[in-house]
């Protein structure tokens, strides 16, 4: 028994229940490609009910080449949805081929990080709509040409119903009230890599990765949207062995991807690109978190190549040899050095910079894949990615950027005027009048604020100060003029009256003992200044250790009230003690306090350094008092001077 081989039925390209002729029609004026749509009589288009009976359009969210996106409500469930209107040519029932690709690809996608296509809706009005009579915006045209409006406005409308997302990444980055921490950035990047890896493993190219196409719902889940430029990829799916994926040999158009997110191989005119073009866009999004704006803003296609090489450096033959054989190889004659590390070193550590450099590798076959980028050490170091992303209680979309800018301008205009900074010198005023360069250094320096002065003082005095030990490297601080609080012995003052800690403070300086003459001889400013003047005139011995003097000695403010204390007259030729530099004097100066040395028929008084370094002040009980039994001349100090000092 023989069987007859029947020819298999020809597969017809279908979307829903609409049969389509696989003939692509190209518009001569715009260069856009369409598919001619033909349906049978009395056939329900796309198998759904009429649009007006199920959905209601509200505000406009965005606009694209082939349609507009609105915020809408499903009347049956009162659920918010996003309605994407697809432009249809009226004269020949032409359906955009990019919309057809987007619909077919979204129907095959099922991932948490990819936007879900709910349904396709068809609405047909009996008469063509116009902008003035239609209750909702129809058509997508540019300019004010009435003829173009009539071509684009038609009675047939196709709508893609998508879940409504409260925010997109562009709106969040431009919102001044939103700040992303590093843990939030890692959370978003991991979700983005998960979604793009799913797309590549299913052998598709997105070809329009940018912040405006990255949506985030109210639960913090990232969704990749806008598959209008997506298409099938005929190469092998990416894997861990080949970083940039294997090329398929198929030619693709180079007019894809928004210019600022366009990969360098597309900029140089390569049409045999791979899935690495989407990885470059993810690298641009990653860097945009830290500058709040696109990092590669080229004005033209040629300028875009210069901007890329200024950031990553001009590639050599070893780094990217294919670049010298592409149509745009003229850009390789530049000589730029990479500025990536210098530009982002403040925001990223070495691990983060390594991930960014691999995402933005110039050679597409050396560029990291999404599968491998997910395992980068950057995502496994502190701070770890947040388990759930937290968003503000407001909607943030790309259409809100103008509102954010106006809010910033209003807040700046409502600020009070700044305080005057003072007048400039006459010389600078003459320069300003004559047109000479006005130096910035000419402004009057501002006095340091109290907190600046306080910050230079250590938090607490050194421990050696409480036991009286001398420290040689203690900075000299100005003596406070405020009255010091008095307290009990062996205690430290507390409460609001406590002064800032001073490294030169000791118990003796905090609670000074009044002298036998009723004058504070240790800490008062007047006594300090008076003693300093008196010492400079030679009244005090210059051989005294300056550090011990500054720390432990202070002469009285007025010595005239004590008749027994008189300033010794210094002999001609120098201060009083320095004239008597003999062996007896040098020997006696180191034996203790209040020692006298015999020098001829004159006596010199020299208080030597204390042998006990822990002694505080001159009136210590450890220093022995010795009276001189020899006769004194008029230039000899009385013996009770030692008691005073």
Curated annotation (Swiss-Prot):
Compositionally biased intervals (Pro residues): 477-486
GO cellular component entries: nucleus; serine/threonine protein kinase complex
Keywords, sorted A to Z: ATP-binding, Kinase, Nucleotide-binding, Nucleus, Serine/threonine-protein kinase, Transferase
Localization: Nucleus
Domain Protein kinase: 55-379
Record SMART domains: S_TKc
Keyword set includes DNA-binding: no
Lineage: Eukaryota, Fungi, Dikarya, Ascomycota, Saccharomycotina
Protein name, per record: Serine/threonine-protein kinase BUR1
Positions contributing to ATP binding: 61-69, 84
Superkingdom of this protein's organism: Eukaryota
Disulfide bonds: none
Species of the source: Kluyveromyces lactis (strain ATCC 8585 / CBS 2359 / DSM 70799 / NBRC 1267 / NRRL Y-1140 / WM37) (Yeast)
Region feature Disordered, mapped onto this chain: 407-428, 442-513, 533-645
């Amino acid at each position: 028994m023989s069987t007859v081989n029947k020819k298999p039925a020809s597969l017809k390209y279908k979307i829903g229940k609409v049969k389509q002729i696989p003939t692509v029609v190209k518009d001569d004026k715009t260069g856009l490609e369409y598919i001619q749509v033909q349906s049978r009589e009395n056939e329900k288009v796309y198998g759904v009910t009429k649009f007006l009976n199920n959905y209601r359009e509200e505000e406009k969210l965005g606009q694209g080449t082939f349609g507009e996106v609105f915020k809408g409500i499903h009347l049956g469930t009162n659920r918010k949805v996003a309605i994407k209107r697809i432009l249809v040519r009226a004269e020949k029932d032409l359906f955009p081929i990019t919309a057809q690709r987007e619909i077919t690809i979204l129907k095959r996608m099922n991932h948490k990080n990819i936007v879900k296509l709910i349904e396709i809706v068809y609405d047909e009005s009996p008469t063509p709509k116009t902008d003035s009579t239609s209750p909702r915006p129809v058509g997508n045209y540019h300019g004010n040409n009435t003829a173009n409006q009539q071509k684009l406005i038609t009675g047939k409308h196709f709508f893609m119903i998508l879940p409504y997302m409260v925010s997109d990444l562009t709106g969040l980055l431009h919102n001044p009230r939103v700040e992303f921490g590093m843990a939030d950035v890692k959370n978003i990047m991991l979700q983005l890599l998960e979604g793009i890896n799913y797309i590549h493993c299913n052998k598709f190219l997105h070809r329009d990765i940018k912040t405006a196409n990255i949506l985030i719902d109210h639960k913090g889940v990232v969704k990749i949207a806008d598959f209008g430029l997506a298409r099938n990829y005929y190469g092998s799916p990416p894997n861990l062995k080949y970083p940039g994926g294997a090329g398929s040999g198929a030619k693709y158009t180079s007019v894809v991807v928004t210019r600022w997110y366009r990969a360098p191989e597309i900029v140089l005119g390569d049409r045999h690109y791979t899935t690495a073009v989407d990885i470059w866009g993810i690298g641009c999004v990653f860097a945009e978190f830290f500058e709040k704006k696109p990092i590669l803003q080229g004005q033209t296609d040629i300028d875009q190549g210069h901007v890329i090489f200024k950031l990553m450096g001009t590639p050599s033959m070893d780094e990217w040899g294919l670049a010298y054989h592409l149509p745009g190889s003229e850009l390789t004659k530049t000589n730029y050095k990479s500025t990536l590390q210098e530009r982002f070193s403040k925001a990223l550590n070495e691990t983060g910079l390594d991930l960014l450099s691999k995402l933005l590798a110039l050679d597409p076959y050396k560029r990291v894949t999404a599968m491998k980028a997910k395992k980068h050490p950057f995502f496994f170091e502190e701070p770890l990615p947040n388990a759930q992303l937290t968003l503000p209680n407001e909607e943030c979309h790309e259409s809100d950027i103008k509102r954010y800018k106006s809010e910033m301008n209003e807040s700046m205009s409502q600020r009070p005027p700044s305080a005057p900074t003072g007048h400039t010198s006459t010389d600078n005023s003459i320069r300003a009048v004559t047109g000479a360069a006005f130096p910035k250094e000419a402004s009057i320096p501002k006095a340091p604020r109290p907190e600046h002065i306080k910050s230079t003082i250590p938090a607490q005095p050194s421990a050696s100060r409480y036991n009286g030990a001398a420290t040689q490297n203690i900075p000299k601080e100005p003596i406070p003029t405020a009255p010091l609080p008095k307290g009990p012995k062996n205690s430290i003052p507390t409460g609001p009256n406590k002064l800032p800690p001073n490294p030169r403070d000791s118990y003796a300086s905090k609670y000074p003992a009044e002298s036998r003459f009723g004058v504070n001889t240790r800490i008062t400013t007047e006594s300090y200044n008076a003693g300093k003047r008196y010492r400079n005139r030679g009244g005090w011995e210059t051989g005294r250790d300056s550090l011990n003097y500054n720390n432990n000695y202070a002469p009285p403010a007025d010595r005239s009230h004590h008749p027994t204390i008189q300033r010794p007259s210094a002999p001609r030729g120098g201060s009083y003690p320095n004239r008597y530099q003999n062996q007896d004097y040098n020997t006696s100066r180191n034996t203790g306090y209040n020692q006298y040395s015999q020098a001829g028929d004159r006596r010199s008084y020299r208080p030597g350094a204390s042998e006990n370094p822990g002694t505080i002040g001159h009136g210590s009980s450890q220093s022995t008092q010795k009276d001189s039994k020899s006769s004194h001349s008029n230039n000899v100090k009385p013996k009770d001077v030692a008691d005073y000092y």
